[in-house]
């Protein structure tokens, strides 16, 4: 073997050449004229040994602002949360790490049970009846929810709050274009969905209304008031929710939500650039046969022992591709497992305590900003994010903070012209009092 990763011997080459009727490599390429063949050595560096390569890659990676050396106040959909050490241990086990869709239940009970437990925990958090095995991420889960609503109601108009994550709204627009659906944005007022505008837009042509809870600005939407407006015209009520926040907030299911979706990233999934993430999708029983993605159910075998299987598979593309509820094939099962392990390790009280710490530390940060003379833009209740008026370009502020080993908040001016110079600050349970005080003092010094 000439190369550790290319297990081809000289005997292998000889056998392959003989099979196609040539004796040498030169004879194989004889139809290429000598005049156009490359001669000499390529102008690239010589190969490195594994230790040399690891050293060089580590040096390159060290240029990044990483969460081991920087205090992060950046959220906007991806958060720096505590992940129990056991998470990586469990998801690294080969029976989980390399598993694919468990079509054969007799040899996939471990994987199926893990998915079933994920579904169960999502239902408990959201207050819904049924949850699927996961989606790609929160954005695609939101778009799939809108597609379900349009198909169920046979209506073409989708109302979405402008306080929903901008990237999720962009994914929705992409899905809607292919299905010839109309997406109408409902403006926000004082950091939450403008209910007067919503009331004026909801009519018998609306398939669904989509809001986020807490919303993109961190504010807690008034779901009870929104639900009354939405269901007046028998439209579906879709709520995108941070699952960790539901350890403290009343779950959307208690407010009459028809579909609850979101991203399980806060539970055991690191803040890696670009993902992967783990979307979740939960509904009432009324939509059980229309929910996209895999569903795992509990049953008993011929001996009466508990077992787990993929259920209601007639909805899926490997059974009826042309009539499938969705053509999502593989899901984020490994990340769903990570979320399940994290939630299990934390336990109910741990999830509640984690949510409580997010609230209390974010409230402390808000008070410190106000004491320093900053304006916190919205006055409503929030979870772990709030908006600060920087009075200058947020990029300038963040560039200065990076010099102090601080990753600043999200620049809202990128998505909302009316919020130029405003920073969305995220404060999770991992931030210390000292880190919060340093952030406020450094921003005060460059105000």
Swiss-Prot record:
Catalytic activity as recorded in UniProt: N(6)-[(R)-lipoyl]-L-lysyl-[glycine-cleavage complex H protein] + glycine + H(+) = N(6)-[(R)-S(8)-aminomethyldihydrolipoyl]-L-lysyl-[glycine-cleavage complex H protein] + CO2
GO BP of this protein: glycine decarboxylation via glycine cleavage system; nucleoside metabolic process
EC numbers: 1.4.4.2
Highest taxon above the source species: Bacteria
InterPro entries in the cross-refs: GcvPA, GDC-P_N, GDC_P, PyrdxlP-dep_Trfase, PyrdxlP-dep_Trfase_major, PyrdxlP-dep_Trfase_small
GO molecular function: glycine dehydrogenase (decarboxylating) activity
SUPFAM superfamilies named among the record's database cross-references: PLP-dependent transferases
Function recorded in the entry: The glycine cleavage system catalyzes the degradation of glycine. The P protein binds the alpha-amino group of glycine through its pyridoxal phosphate cofactor; CO(2) is released and the remaining methylamine moiety is then transferred to the lipoamide cofactor of the H protein.
Protein name: Probable glycine dehydrogenase (decarboxylating) subunit 1
Source organism: Bacillus thuringiensis subsp. konkukian (strain 97-27)
Lineage of origin: Bacteria, Bacillati, Bacillota, Bacilli, Bacillales
